[in-house]
Amino acid sequence: MAPRILLCGDPLGRLNQLFKRVQSVSKSAGPFDALICVGQFFPDSPEILDEFLDYVEGRAQVPIPTYFTGDYGVVAPKILSTTSKKAENQGFKMDGLEVCHNLFWLRGSGKFSLHGLSVAYLSGRQSSESQFGKYSQDDVDALRALAEEPGGVDLFLTNEWPAGVTNRAAVSDIPVGISDSSCSDSTVSELVMEVKPRYHIAGSMGVFYAREPYLNAESTHVTRFIGLAQVGNKNKQKFLHALSPTPTSTMSPAELSAKPPKTTLWPYNLQDGAAESKKRPNDSDSDSQYWRYDVPKRQKSGSQGEKLCFKFVCSGSCPRGEDCHFQHNAEAREQCRRGVCLDLIIKGKCEKGPECSYKHEFQDESSIQRKPRSENANRSKECWFCLSSPSVESHLIVSVGESFYCALPKGSLVEDHILIIPIEHLPNTLVLSPEVESELSRYQNGLRNCYKSQGNDAVFFELVSKRVSHANLQVVPVPSSRARLLPNIFSLAAEKLGFKLVTKKFNDSTDGRKYLQKEYNAALGLFYVELPDGTVLSHTLEENEVFPAQFGREVLAGLLKIPDRADWRNCKISQEEEAKLAEDFKKQFQEFDPCQ
């Protein structure tokens, strides 16, 4: 039986009115499995704050599992900040952070299964002055990556409407005043073209609009756009809509490719000049969906300075074909396919710093129309961990050896959290020569002894992935009294996320690393942990597996009862404070440092 879902526009904190309507509809046409809200979820003003807080604080009950994306409005920062720090909300969660019983915040962007339906979402708005309510470029990039995964998307949730959605639609059906492109979001247009959902649900416009189905480029199924009004709006516009779609995963190709009556062409690529001029002030709005940045001077061919087609670089194809005004650069596409940072490819630089998880050097000899540079020069300039890089944060370094150096990470989990980093640009610490491995072993033993002198044990972990261009072995001290809990807590966390850790016990840490070197498959990836008692936990990543990059840190944050520090971005401090921590650790480590 197909799941039954209720969709709602901006609640604006009017939860009494919303849930009263939900219960009424449920009696006549229910039951329903879930309620999904798009648009502003929190109140516009303090006047109905008490009503809203009754639900959040448990004095009133949310009657149905409810998911929301509009994380802005009065008290949103306070409530969502508290929600983020809850222990049960730590870790890699795309299916919603629990605010209270039956109420879930869809943070950032993600994709999850809801009663068999594949649901993708982009939370927040394009711009906001607050921490909450604004989506980031990382959220957009993550959603693009998820869109490339196999399997279709049934529901795509955004707060704002996609720019151009009314193009090619029946004029008589378009609500008055909503064709103004300033009230819609071109980034959402780009994303919906890549996600290709069967249903796209959005709020924020204050009106109800069910557009005719439209055809998708490079896909056989159609997309239906549904815009929903605000709860309690004065014009009696529809704010609650029931839907019972059959999950894509259970549909036959014939069912998926069925074309309902009044199906239109794809709305985001109008080429007809007359129609275009009636619906938009100029052609630049449409073009803006295909490129993001001017190509830097060193990337330009001739004097034209063509812009790269963002759609082609991301997916390898462009619906415009020869009609596209932007550059279809096959080399740029190849670099994207190999995991190179899009900003580096298109802008010529990445400004995200250590937050960026993509590669920061090109993966073959091609220069993508750049001036040729040596491989080492390329690496040292773009890599955040190469000592010769201008981006390296030298004030964090606490020891330098022949083949490795030790440094504090940005936003350390605890004060003595250390990274062991190879000086040579290596993708992981499992591809070392015997001499280099020997120095790594000496550093590990030195850190073990240093921590032991303080009543702690050392936990080492590393994520070996194609997206990690320069290796860093993380080392975190844990109280010796809690070390015995490590195997179980790691295994339980892995099971919760849907994978298993292989457990092997060794009498000598050297034997453990030899085992890991044999297990490592360069074509795949590996996550491993070296525990104080000689136990090695490991998980080989399957092809296309999305592994939580912060898994090791999140597990240890839970063990140490500091879940609010699971995200390193919550732990940022000033450069002066970082330098002091580094100096303090140097003094502690001095007698144990193998390179002193």
Swiss-Prot record:
SMART domains, alphabetized: ZnF_C3H1 (SM00356)
InterPro entries (alphabetical): Cwf19-like, Cwf19-like_C_dom-1, Cwf19-like_C_dom-2, HIT-like_sf, Znf_CCCH, Znf_CCCH_sf
Superkingdom of origin organism: Eukaryota
Keyword Translocase recorded: no
Disulphide bridges, residue numbers: none
Any Pfam family hit: CwfJ_C_1
Region of interest (Disordered), residue spans: 243-263, 272-291
Keywords: DNA-binding, Metal-binding, Repeat, Zinc, Zinc-finger
Zinc finger map (C3H1-type): 303-331, 335-363
Annotated GO MF terms: DNA binding; zinc ion binding
Name assigned to this protein: Zinc finger CCCH domain-containing protein 64
Biological source species: Arabidopsis thaliana
Phylogenetic lineage: Eukaryota, Viridiplantae, Streptophyta, Embryophyta, Tracheophyta
